[in-house]
């Protein structure tokens, strides 16, 4: 039997730290794959092919972000019932979440595939890259069920306190993805569509193997026929938690698309600098996201176990780890931003290098605000208040839209650099009082 891990006993800091490490490695793996995938497409298929993939990225994030958010939400009741040692209800939640995933993923795949071309036309996709973007997007949308199940199974396993098993399946998916990228593009000559097929196929294989492993190795998840029956009440609970988390990702994506569009109007140098800086920033942001994901499981289990005071202990421990990491990252990016920028552009591109440095220096200065955002947002989600977490996403969207419409026309690229930090500040201004409200409420619930 594979080991699940209860996070309701023991010191919070080592528990969260050990749980975070595999999540961090997984997130770093995803960012590394993103870079390699772009390099393969760009170097072997050319600039237009790379632009075709880029033209689809924001829409893919919009749709897959919703799916991934729902999967994370579906794992929260599982974590809560696991923490409460109510294993029968936990298994029923797992069964219903799989049933919901089947219906939702097929509906999303069908609708988005039908309107794929219309979506690209609405985004004013240039004609010279339209065909490549269309096939890349179409294959990605057709593969939504594989992506949905892969992320749902990983979420369920993490809910049981096991963050290592999802990492190994992510590693398998990444290696297979890169190998298939090379095979489909270089050997079969399938072009941009081949890159999308490689991603969908590798996630499909990983999802199937993950399900087989989960059912064979986690005895606690083996269901009876009665436990596998669809339950409307449980389905409503899952949707109540999962859909707001999905919408949170999609809402955030809308604000990011607006900021990207405003930056596009500033010229090639700003676009290139923004692209390079975002890739670097996303890599260094991984620990914050990983800490947040760990807090979702930690808070969910302790909420289910009736130990809300441990949630505050977890927040303090996570904040301490976040500050230590930020101090390290601040030094690295303040003195090494240009070195990282040189991974993307030649040393002669002085304007791009300067703009990349500026973006990274401003972003890293506000990383503690981002770290607190991730910790509080995921903690609130973990105890089931996903609507509040979604509203923090709305706060981010509003901030980015305001920066895009009001600040960028007046201050140019400098305003773009402050777009994300402004969004983080807006979100924290909402999340801090929201967390205080939620924490006090669950303390009162325990007393009553």
Protein language model features and the residues they cover:
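Interfacial/gating helices of multi-pass transporter permease domains
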Residues: 41-61, 127-132, 192-193, 234-241, ...
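Short alpha-helical transmembrane segments in multi-pass integral membrane proteins
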Residues: 1-20, 78-143, 187-243, 299-366, ...
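Hydrophobic transmembrane alpha-helices of multi-pass small-molecule transporters
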Residues: 62-65, 109, 177-181, 207-211, ...
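Short runs within selected transmembrane alpha-helices of multi-pass transporters and secretion channels
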Residues: 71, 139-158, 166-174, 195-210, ...
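Signature of the first transmembrane helix
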Residues: 14-75, 79, 243-263
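Helix-terminus/linker motif at the lipid-water interface of multi-pass membrane proteins
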Residues: 28, 32-51, 120-127, 183-190, ...
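Transmembrane helical elements of multi-pass membrane transporters/channels
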Residues: 18-34, 139, 150, 173, ...
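Small-residue-rich hydrophobic transmembrane alpha-helices
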Residues: 50-110, 147-166, 273-337, 370-392
């Amino acid at each position: 039997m594979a080991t699940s891990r209860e996070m309701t006993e023991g010191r919070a800091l080592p528990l969260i730290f050990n749980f975070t490490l595999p999540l961090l490695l997984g997130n770093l793996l995803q960012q590394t794959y993103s870079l390699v995938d772009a390099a393969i497409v760009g170097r072997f298929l050319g600039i237009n092919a790379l632009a075709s993939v880029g033209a689809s990225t924001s829409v893919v994030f919009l749709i897959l972000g919703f799916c991934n958010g729902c999967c994370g939400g579906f794992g929260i009741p599982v974590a809560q019932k696991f923490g409460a040692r109510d294993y029968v209800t936990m298994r029923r939640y797992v069964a219903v979440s799989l049933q919901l995933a089947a219906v939702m993923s097929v509906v999303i795949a069908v609708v988005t595939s039908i309107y794929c071309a219309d979506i690209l036309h609405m985004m004013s996709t240039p004609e010279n890259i339209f065909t490549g973007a269309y096939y890349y997007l179409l294959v990605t949308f057709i593969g939504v069920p594989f992506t949905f199940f892969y992320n749902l199974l990983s979420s369920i396993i993490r809910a049981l306190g096991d963050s290592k098993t999802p990492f190994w399946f992510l590693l398998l998916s990444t290696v297979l993805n890169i190998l298939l990228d090379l095979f489909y593009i270089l050997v079969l000559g399938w072009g941009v569509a081949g890159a999308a097929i490689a991603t969908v196929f590798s996630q499909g294989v990983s999802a199937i193997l993950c399900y087989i492993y989960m059912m064979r190795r986690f005895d606690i998840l083996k269901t009876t026929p009665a436990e596998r029956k669809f339950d409307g009440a449980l389905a409503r609970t899952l949707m109540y938690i999962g859909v707001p988390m999905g919408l949170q990702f999609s809402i955030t994506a809308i604000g990011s698309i607006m900021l990207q569009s405003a930056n596009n109007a500033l010229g090639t140098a700003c676009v290139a600098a923004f692209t390079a800086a975002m890739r670097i920033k996303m890599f260094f942001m991984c620990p914050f996201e990983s800490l947040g994901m760990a807090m979702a499981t930690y808070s969910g289990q302790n909420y289910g176990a009736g130990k809300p005071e441990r949630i505050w202990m977890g927040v303090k421990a996570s904040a301490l780890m976040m500050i230590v990491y930020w101090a390290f990252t601040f030094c690295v990016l303040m003195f090494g931003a240009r070195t990282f920028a040189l991974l993307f552009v030649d040393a002669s591109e002085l304007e791009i290098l300067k703009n990349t440095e500026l973006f990274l220096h401003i972003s890293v200065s506000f990383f503690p605000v981002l770290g607190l955002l991730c910790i509080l947002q995921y903690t609130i989600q973990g105890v089931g208040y996903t609507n509040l977490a979604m509203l923090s996403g709305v706060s981010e969207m509003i901030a980015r839209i305001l920066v895009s419409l009001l600040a960028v026309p007046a201050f140019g690229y400098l305003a773009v650099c402050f777009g994300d930090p402004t969004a983080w500040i807006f979100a924290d201004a909402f999340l801090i009082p929201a967390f205080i409200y939620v924490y006090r409420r669950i303390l009162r619930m325990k007393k009553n």
